[in-house]
UniProtKB/Swiss-Prot annotation:
This is Uncharacterized ORF3 protein. It comes from Torque teno tamarin virus (isolate So-TTV2). It comes from the Viruses. Residues 1-159 are annotated as: Disordered. Residues 77-86, 146-159 have a biased composition (Basic residues).
Amino acid sequence: MTRQDYYCKIRKKRRPGRGDTSATSDGGTSPKRPLRDSWNLLPQRRAAHKKRREETRRSELPPTYYGPKTSTAGCRRPQRRPRKLERRQSPALRKPTTTTPNSRKGSRKRSTTRTEDTDSSWPTYEESETDSWVTTSSDSDEYPPKTRRAHKTAPRLRL
C-alpha cells in the first residue's frame, strides 16, 4: 500500500455525510454538526457581550472611578518606574555582574578563563544568610563541591 492509497482511504472515511465526523479533508464541517456558521458569528457576539458587560459594570461603580483614560495612564506610570530602577541597581546585586569589558563579546574560551576572576569577587554570595546551608553542611564530604559558575544571568535573577 503506497502512501497515496493510505491517505485516499483516510479521506474516504472522512468524507462529509458520514455520521458526525466534524473533520473533513478540506477542513470544513460535516452535515450533522455545521460549526462554520457559529464560528463566523463568534467575534461579533463576543464584542457585543463585552460591551454589555462593561456597561453594566460602569453603571454599578461611581462615575469618578472610570476617569478619562489619558489621565490615569499619565498618573500611574511615574510611580511605577523608580521602584524598578531601585531593584535593578541595588549595590549588593550589581557587584558580581561587573566583569571585564570584553565579557559582552561572548567568546567561549574567554568565559572559561573568567571563572576564577568571578569566584574571587563572590564573598557577598557566601555571606548571605539564605545560602548558609551550601557552605556549612555536615554532608559536604559526601557530595562534590558546588561550583559557583552559573548562567551569565544568574546574579540578576537573585532578587
